[in-house]
């Protein structure tokens, strides 16, 4: 595979993208930093097909990224391959306003092949290619220039090996008849709503034991205010105000802006500046939530009770058995919420009860719940047996 020098000029990038536009697939990775910002700062993009690979410097002065943007988000004839691509996709969506499509994620593929629950890239490379990757540049400040040879070698290895891994994983999936298993997971991965932080929904991430409509209304307004401030100023939301501070303000709202100086966790200057004024406006304009807007407590665990918790343990044992038999990661078949939903009788839209998941696990899970199957020990091994009707 040809490895190009770091691309910093528009003509070289355009020529590369023109060649890659004829590929069946491209492997993609990004390097970024986000410790001190709300939005991740894109510092490097690595890209490869089965013939060539390059790292692209998005921080290079005057670099026209249009050809790369077109390749990533406007060309749907090329499959885009990532490993654990959630953060890469978030960055691409933020910078281009669109999602790459179609997608393939090698971490999810590895789960479907029973390699591991969330296998890391280096472990996957070592398993399939017998190559041990150098991890020395993992904690690089990718925004610092110039990047040295070791940093660039580390970065480019993220796509050169990925381009080799992808055909191997795809063939194994097809040989095992699992090519379609990933469709639902890839659709979820490509859903832009997975990566967009809606200020109006940000309050739902904050733990709040109080269920009063007026308090929750203030919390919603405060969380939206914080999210917008963080986005506009491009700083982490926690540096605006901690969750606990917002919860306290929602329960004990200050009467005047000058009272903000007494609130622990807020800057004293907010008692008289524009930020404090916007915070007070959020509190004053907050509306109590309507009954239907108040999230229901997670009563599922209470609903299923202690026996339900033990039934969940039995279902998890069954899941572990069937995942082992099928050589697929249990987490890809069913999550705890899916299992609790089965026990609580919530069977509509449960992914476990459709398609291949139903065949591997869901069918027997329902039979176990309905008393039609039971665990038994046969020749020292746990097995499932049908219960014959009297």
UniProtKB/Swiss-Prot annotation:
One of its GO terms (biological process) is tRNA 3'-end processing. It is found in: Cytoplasm. Its main location: cytoplasm. Its cofactor is a divalent metal cation. It holds the Pfam family HRDC. Its EC number is 3.1.13.5. SUPFAM superfamilies: HRDC-like (SSF47819), Ribonuclease H-like (SSF53098). Residues 7-173 form the 3'-5' exonuclease domain. InterPro entries: 3'-5'_exonuclease_dom, HRDC-like_sf, HRDC_dom, HRDC_dom_sf, RNase_D, RNase_D-like, RNaseH-like_sf, RNaseH_sf. GO terms for cellular component: cytoplasm. It comes from the Bacteria. Keywords: Cytoplasm, Exonuclease, Hydrolase, Nuclease, tRNA processing. It catalyses: Exonucleolytic cleavage that removes extra residues from the 3'-terminus of tRNA to produce 5'-mononucleotides. One of its GO terms (molecular function) is 3'-5' exonuclease activity. Residues 212-293 form the HRDC domain. Exonuclease involved in the 3' processing of various precursor tRNAs. Initiates hydrolysis at the 3'-terminus of an RNA molecule and releases 5'-mononucleotides. HAMAP family: RNase_D (MF_01899). Belongs to the RNase D family. This is Ribonuclease D. The gene is rnd.
